[in-house]
């Protein structure tokens, strides 16, 4: 049986995640307040950020940047596309 959460990203009840997707308090906050569709949207946005900015998840500075963007994207609705990003047709 799936969990239901009030998704802060979508501002509606949504199917909750099956597991805590990120370590620490932030991971628990995501698990309690973000739905599966919103998490999938974040993963797509994160992939775009990594590719467009040539980030490496191994680099501590890049991980810190991605974590900040994660919070902006899921909880603050303040995430932006990378400078010069143009989606493929």
Curated annotation (Swiss-Prot):
One of its GO terms (cellular component) is cytosol. Belongs to the Fe(2+)-trafficking protein family. It comes from Stenotrophomonas maltophilia (strain R551-3). Could be a mediator in iron transactions between iron acquisition and iron-requiring processes, such as synthesis and/or repair of Fe-S clusters in biosynthetic enzymes. Keywords: Iron. GO terms for biological process: cellular response to oxidative stress. This is Probable Fe(2+)-trafficking protein. Gene3D superfamilies: Fe(II) trafficking protein YggX. NCBIfam families: PRK05408.1 (NF003817). GO terms for molecular function: iron ion binding. The keyword Glycosyltransferase does not apply. The keyword Iron applies. InterPro entries: Fe_traffick_prot_YggX, Fe_traffick_prot_YggX_sf. The lineage of its organism: Bacteria, Pseudomonadati, Pseudomonadota, Gammaproteobacteria, Lysobacterales. PANTHER family: FE(2+)-TRAFFICKING PROTEIN-RELATED.
